Every structure is written in structure tokens, then in C-alpha cells.
């Protein structure tokens, strides 16, 4: 571990020198690239330097203890030594976590897609509930949300809806939401009071830069049409909605807000995210055949969570977490679930780094 930390610190110093180089300062791409790399290493270097300083301080105390017979001084030095010895294991654990390879998508904005699955109208209503839950969570984190495309249900909620979430670390917070979400409750239209089970699927796609995926203009088919709302009524009187089809894969992205220019930009953003996601999913499927992590495979069909309304209970099946806080969670208070999933992922990766042993 300490060899790795020495390499990280050395690279950090190299970046300091590079960021002082006039050639780099005058090259905006290099400046942005090196500045981001340095920022990513900053926390690790700070903690490692603090750790080394504590080790040196401890060595100095041990040396002073060997040179003094003064009882009062010995007692004081031993107290200082005990305090530092108690700190070191915590710093070591923090360094282990900081050395875990970071998901390259963690800092990115995301496209969230929610689709009503089994359960008819109730599934669509639940899809709307999930949309509201994520919107409230995003707001609490200082993220910005914007609807890209929505197909409303006649009885409330959405048949499907996609929206962007923008803000530093959006993907790191929402990536665990991939999968099938199940709700158990009595629908408002149910006169007999029977509990129904419905599902909605959630896909969280990191937004990608042009350099990460190449899309040729000749591979695109772009159509415009009039957007419609619930019940099929036309929302716009002009052909402002946009549908973009990627011909080689058949992947389609649409956006149906009021501005055709904005719709084209939004649809392209979604198309890039979906094509990138296809590529990532293929790689993950190969990897998942060798190993299944504690937080699941990320498969969209995998049931990840159940929301039980009669018992006010939410259960995340990947880590066996059950919380009797359904009301709070549906109001966007997802921190406890997301923190637990993040910790589970970190523990899993630490096991890998330690060859299966913590």
C-alpha cells in the first residue's frame, strides 16, 4: 500500500511542476486535464502526508522517552504516544479507501430513465412517485433536474420518463438506482382493499463527452413531429419534437419540449449516453460472469428494492438493508440507503485489493 502511496505523491509533485509550465498554462485542454488529475489526488496526498507526519512524531516521542528519566515528562510523552497510536489505524483505513480505483464516471451528470413495468396504471403512478423522489433528492444535493422526454399515463404518473440530473458527483450518488423497483400497496382505485404489486425499472446513464464515443452524422436519422401529452392531445402546434435514430444499432432518443433546437441537443445527449451505456453493459456482462458484487450486477431486470406501503418499509435486496422510513424515503431522503450501498461497494473493492481478505 505504501509503495502505491509514494507513487501517488510523486505524481502529485509532477503535476505541480506541469501546472507551472507555461506550455501547459497556455494549453486549455492540458491545463484542465492536469488540474483535474491533481484535484483527484489531493485528498490522498493530504491524508498520506498527515500519516507520515504522525509516524515521524511518534518516532521522535519514542526517542525522547529513551533519553529521559523525568516521571512527569515520561507520563506526558506516553499520553501523546497513545493518542497518535490511536489515530494511525484510522488514517490507514482512510488511505485504503482512498486507494480504491475510482469509477471514471462518478463525477459526471446523468440521464435517469424510469419506465412503468408490470402493474398497468399502478406501475405508471409508481414511476411518477419515483420521479418525484429522485427530484427531491437531487434538490437536497444541490443538483439540477430537467425533463428530457415524458409519456404521461391517463390515470397519473408516467408510462416512461427520462430526465437529466446535473451536478458534481451526480453519477456517484445515483448509479446504485439501476434496476427494478417493486411497490406493494393498495391502489386508490381498489375498492376491496387488496394489496397490489407493481414494478418500475430505473436506468441511470452517465452523460458522455464527444471524445468518449464517436457518432458519425451519416449514421443518424433525424425526424421531427408534434409532441402529445396524456390522452394523445397535441401539446405543440409545430413539429418541435425530435426523434434521433442511430441506424447501426437501432438506438432511439427523443425529446419533446417546446424548442426544436433544445430538443435536438437533449436527444443527442441521451443518444450518446445510451450508446455509451450499451458499450459499458457489454463489458460489465463479461465481468459479471466472473464475479457478482454485493451491490448487484447493475442488470436493469434485477429486482433491487421493494417499497412496502402497508408496513412503511423499504428493503434494498442487494445488501439486505431494511428501513421503516418509507415516508421519508419517498420524500427524497435517500442518503442512508446510498451511503450503505457506497460502503458496501468500497468494502467489496477493498476485498479485491486484499485478494479476498479484509
Curated annotation (Swiss-Prot):
SMART domains, sorted: PCRF (SM00937)
Entry comment on modification after translation? Methylated by PrmC. Methylation increases the termination efficiency of RF1.
Q: List the disulfide bonds.
A: none
Which residues are recorded with the post-translational modification N5-methylglutamine?
233
Q: Where in the cell is it found?
A: Cytoplasm
Q: Which GO terms describe its cellular component?
A: cytoplasm
What GO MF terms are annotated? translation release factor activity, codon specific
Q: Which domain of life is it from?
A: Bacteria
Keywords, ordered alphabetically: Cytoplasm, Methylation, Protein biosynthesis
Where is the major localization of this protein?
Answer: cytoplasm
- Spell out where the chain crosses the membrane: none
The cross-references to Gene3D superfamilies, in alphabetical order and at most eight, read: 3.30.160.20, 3.30.70.1660, 6.10.140.1950
Q: Name one Pfam family in it.
A: RF-1
The entry assigns this protein to a family as follows:
Belongs to the prokaryotic/mitochondrial release factor family.
Reported function = Peptide chain release factor 1 directs the termination of translation in response to the peptide chain termination codons UAG and UAA.
What PANTHER family would the database entry show? LD18447P
Q: What is this protein called?
A: Peptide chain release factor 1
User: Which species is listed as the source?
Assistant: Staphylococcus aureus (strain bovine RF122 / ET3-1)
Amino acid at each position: 500500500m505504501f509503495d502505491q502511496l509514494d507513487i501517488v505523491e510523486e505524481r502529485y509533485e509532477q503535476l505541480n511542476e506541469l501546472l507551472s509550465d507555461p506550455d501547459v498554462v497556455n494549453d486549455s485542454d492540458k491545463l484542465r486535464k492536469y488540474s483535474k488529475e491533481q484535484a483527484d489526488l489531493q485528498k490522498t496526498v493530504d491524508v498520506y502526508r498527515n500519516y507520515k507526519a504522525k509516524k515521524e512524531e511518534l518516532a521522535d516521542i519514542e526517542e525522547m522517552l529513551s533519553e529521559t528519566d523525568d516521571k512527569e515528562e515520561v507520563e506526558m510523552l506516553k499520553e501523546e504516544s497513545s493518542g497518535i497510536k490511536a489515530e494511525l489505524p484510522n488514517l490507514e483505513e482512510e488511505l485504503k479507501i482512498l486507494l480504491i480505483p475510482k469509477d471514471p464516471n462518478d463525477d459526471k451528470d446523468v440521464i435517469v430513465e424510469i419506465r412503468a413495468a408490470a402493474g398497468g396504471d399502478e406501475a405508471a403512478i409508481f414511476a411518477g412517485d419515483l420521479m418525484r423522489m429522485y427530484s427531491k433528492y437531487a434538490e437536497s444535493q444541490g443538483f439540477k433536474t430537467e425533463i428530457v422526454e415524458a409519456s404521461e399515463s391517463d390515470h397519473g404518473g408516467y408510462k416512461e420518463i427520462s430526465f437529466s440530473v446535473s451536478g458534481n458527483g451526480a453519477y456517484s450518488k445515483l448509479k446504485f438506482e439501476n434496476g427494478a423497483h417493486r411497490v406493494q400497496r393498495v391502489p386508490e382505485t381498489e375498492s376491496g382493499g387488496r394489496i397490489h404489486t407493481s414494478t418500475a425499472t430505473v436506468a441511470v446513464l452517465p452523460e458522455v463527452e464527444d471524445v468518449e464515443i464517436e457518432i458519425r452524422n451519416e449514421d443518424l436519422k433525424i425526424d421531427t413531429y408534434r409532441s402529445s401529452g396524456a390522452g394523445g392531445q397535441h401539446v405543440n402546434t409545430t413539429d418541435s419534437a425530435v426523434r434521433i435514430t442511430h441506424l447501426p444499432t437501432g438506438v432511439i432518443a427523443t425529446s419533446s419540449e417546446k424548442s426544436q433546437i433544445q430538443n435536438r441537443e437533449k436527444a443527442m445527449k441521451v443518444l450518446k449516453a445510451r450508446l455509451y451505456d450499451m458499450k459499458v453493459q457489454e463489458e460489465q456482462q463479461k465481468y459479471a460472469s466472473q464475479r457478482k458484487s454485493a451491490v448487484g450486477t447493475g442488470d436493469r431486470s434485477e429486482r433491487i428494492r421493494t417499497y412496502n406501503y402497508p408496513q412503511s418499509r423499504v428493503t434494498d435486496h442487494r445488501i439486505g438493508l431494511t428501513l421503516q422510513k418509507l415516508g421519508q424515503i419517498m420524500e427524497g431522503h435517500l442518503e442512508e440507503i446510498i451511503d450503505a450501498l457506497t460502503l458496501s461497494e468500497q468494502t467489496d473493492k477493498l476485498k479485491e485489493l486484499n485478494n479476498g481478505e479484509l
